[in-house]
Amino acid sequence: MAFILTTLLLLTLLTLPALLYRLTLILTPSRNKPLRHGRRNPNEPTHLLIILGSGGHTAEMLAMLTRAVTSPDPAQKLNWKDYHHRTWVISEGDSISAERAKEFEEMATPLSTQEDLMAGKVKRATDIGPGGYEIVTVPRAREIHQPLLTAPVSSFKCLRACRELLMKHTTDTRDGHAAMAGEVDFPDLILCNGPATATILVLASVLLRFFDVRGCSTRGKMRTVYVESWARVKRLSLSGRLLSRVVDRFLVQWPQLAKEAVGRIEYRGVLV
């Protein structure tokens, strides 16, 4: 018995430094950037994943995106067609967020296409590929008023669903290689603003990158941007505190929050 315990302790001491080093590599701000030749390259379609919470989280996310796609400032404007495929993630039972996502797509996609045509960037809409979006439902990480005792079970179900979602458009034959022309790959960018589901999904992306599943870490996939809620004026949310050292960029909308010496906080003004 003593021999087994000693062996386990020795293995732990030997592997722990390597595991910590690996975690440091995938979480460093200077980690591998995607090997791309422009977001509009049809051979390298860009995949954007957006996480919607419910109520205020959804309203803020869509307000932020609406402001970006309609901005008159070219430096701040977001061309929606630059993202060949968009995945909207919602929680079970949140039909309102699903409808809001559809409404946004109906507004943003024609707007970006028309502006490209007027600017002479493309001859016709099909020159940059048809693009498309999907709305995917995952189990809630935790229901309202759900006992903390059962929260780990629901969180694990959410984690498993998020892992499957992130790998949905990948194949076993793509290890270490970029997507084939026109294929959708791992998300290139994950955009979130605080719901519990976002925390679980970001954790799932970290686990996949830790083990470099299908070359996702080597190829710089699943870079994450977290935008703290406008309602958070003096203190970060629980999701924010958990993710401030994990995401690639962490944006706050109040200058006093940027003074918190926690993680990678950046103040970029009001974004909603």
Label every model-predicted segment.
Residues 1-29:
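Terminal signal-anchor or tail-anchor transmembrane helices
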Residues 26-50, 59:
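N-terminal signal-anchor transmembrane helix
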Residues 14, 51-52, 56-84, 92-93, ...:
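Active-site and donor-binding regions of nucleotide-sugar-utilizing enzymes
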Residues 98:
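Phosphate-coordination/substrate-recognition cap region in phosphate-metabolizing enzymes
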